[in-house]
């Protein structure tokens, strides 16, 4: 098996085991047995079991369709911004509460961000925010960068709350309401 294929196999197998048995109920040894590799081979490709989560969240941009980045015909910038964030939330919900909670714990220990920043997503959201401000859909005068950072922190916060209450809230609706309030979205933009 090629080096890249081994790492891919470890990651794919790990996620399947985590989904089936829960993150804490799966050991590195079980991952190795399922992949038919030795522990030294595992550690040659990954630093730790926790490191597996980083790879899963680094791939978050693969869940955003290429078409979303092409928005030349868009007139409701607010709506397009929410679509982008809803793709991220879909990924979070697909991961599930168990793995997303573990991701929070790992990132708190390592003092890193929960969601890996994807440059293309960042740039597109900032462009859409500026266009939305110019169109009068977003009334908050803060810079697009500031509003982007607010949005990402809101997403982390609502994601953490979703984990704490075991998914008994509507993560999508609550996030969009919070984002709308933060951006001071013009009421008409909600109905286009």
Describe each region flagged by the PLM.
Residues 48-52, 100:
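A secondary-structure capping/hinge motif
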Residues 55, 66-94, 147-151:
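Hydrophobic alpha-helical connector segments
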Residues 89-126:
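Short secondary-structure transition hinges
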Residues 35-46:
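Short hydrophobic/aromatic patch on the recognition helix
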Residues 33, 47-48, 58:
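Residue-level detection of the helix-turn-helix DNA-binding "recognition helix"
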Residues 1-21, 25-37, 51:
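Basic, helix-initiating cap at the start of DNA-binding domains
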Residues 52-60:
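Alpha-helical DNA-contacting segments of helix-turn-helix folds
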Residues 83, 90, 123, 127-135, ...:
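C-terminal peripheral helix-coil segments that are non-catalytic and often amphipathic
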């Amino acid at each position: 098996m090629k080096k890249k294929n081994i790492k891919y196999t470890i990651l794919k197998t790990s996620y399947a085991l985590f989904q089936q048995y829960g993150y804490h109920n799966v050991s590195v040894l079980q991952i190795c047995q399922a992949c038919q590799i030795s522990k030294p081979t595992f550690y040659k490709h990954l630093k730790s079991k926790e490191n597996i989560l980083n790879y899963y969240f680094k791939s978050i941009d693969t869940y955003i369709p290429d078409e979303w980045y092409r928005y030349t015909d868009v007139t409701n910038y607010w709506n397009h911004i929410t679509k982008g964030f809803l793709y991220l939330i879909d990924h979070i919900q697909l991961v599930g509460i168990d793995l997303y909670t573990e991701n929070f714990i790992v990132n708190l220990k390592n003092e890193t961000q929960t969601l890996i920043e994807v440059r293309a997503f960042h740039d597109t959201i900032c462009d859409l925010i500026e266009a939305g401000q110019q169109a009068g859909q977003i009334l908050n005068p803060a810079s697009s960068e500031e509003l982007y950072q607010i949005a990402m922190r809101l997403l982390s916060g609502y994601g953490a709350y979703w984990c704490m209450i075991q998914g008994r809230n509507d993560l999508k609706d609550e996030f969009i309401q919070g984002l709308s309030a933060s951006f001071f979205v013009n009421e008409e933009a909600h109905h286009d």
